[in-house]
Each structure stands twice: as structure tokens, then as C-alpha cells.
């Protein structure tokens, strides 16, 4: 199947109903995308599919055909990554890639309300969210 993966053309052979999460990690070696719950409840596996945040554990590989898929590796050195470090928006790190990708999808300078709504599907057991919100607002 052909797609654009992290800004580059890619062709990956995998069963169409395999989870996008598993294809990214196992076939493509992109292990920055984390599996938390495997049920679409935690947001740890969030990636961008045609610039929209999706839980990769819920998306069949076939849905990525011809699409643009962006993982945390595709952001390179995005300012949000530094902001998360500067504002201690990450502790254990399991939720961080998904949080950053969900935040990227919010666009530039989102309001606190937009951040809270945009990250509602991304759970964090460590930070209490305020540091994450500050990190996103700082960029």
C-alpha cells in the first residue's frame, strides 16, 4: 500500500485489517507511537491521518492507503517537543507522543479551552495536565 509517511512517499506491505499502530511499530520501525489501552480510550497511540488526530489502535491499515500519516518521528524537532521539556509536560513519557501530535493538530496559539477540548481523548496519569497545557500555550 502506498502512502505518505512522515512527509516521504512510502510503500508498506501489511494485511489491510492490521492496526495502523502495529504496522507503524512492527513494519516501519516507528516505535515512538505508543500503545496504552489498545481500545482508543487513552490517546497514547495518537497519530495524524491527513492532519487529523486519530487513535492508531483503532484504524485499520487499509484506511491509510493514499493518506498522509504523521508520527512523532515525523515532527523532527518541533517546538512543542522542547516546550514539553521546558515546562515538565512529560514524566513517564507514554502519553507524550500522542499529546504532542494532538496539540499539533490544534494549530498555532490555541486557547486554553481549545487545548482542553482537543486533548480530551489523551490521558495522562503523571502530570495533572496543567504542565501540558502550559507547554502548549508557550509555543
Residue ranges and their predicted role:
Residues 1-139:
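Signature of N-terminal electron-transfer/Fe-S-associated modules in redox systems
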Amino acid at each position: 500500500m502506498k502512502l505518505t509517511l512522515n512527509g516521504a512517499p512510502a510503500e508498506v506491505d501489511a494485511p489491510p485489517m492490521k492496526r495502523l499502530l502495529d504496522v507503524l511499530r512492527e513494519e516501519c520501525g516507528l516505535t515512538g507511537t505508543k500503545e496504552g489501552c489498545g481500545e482508543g480510550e487513552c490517546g497514547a497511540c495518537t497519530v495524524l491521518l491527513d492532519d487529523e488526530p486519530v487513535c492508531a489502535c483503532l484504524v485499520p491499515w487499509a484506511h491509510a492507503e493514499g493518506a498522509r500519516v504523521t508520527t512523532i518521528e515525523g515532527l523532527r524537532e518541533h517546538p512543542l517537543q522542547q516546550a514539553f521539556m521546558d515546562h515538565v509536560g512529560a514524566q513517564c513519557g507514554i502519553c507524550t507522543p500522542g499529546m504532542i501530535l494532538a496539540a499539533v493538530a490544534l494549530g498555532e496559539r490555541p486557547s486554553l479551552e481549545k487545548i482542553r477540548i482537543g486533548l480530551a481523548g489523551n490521558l495522562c496519569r503523571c502530570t495533572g495536565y496543567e504542565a501540558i497545557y502550559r507547554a502548549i500555550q508557550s509555543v
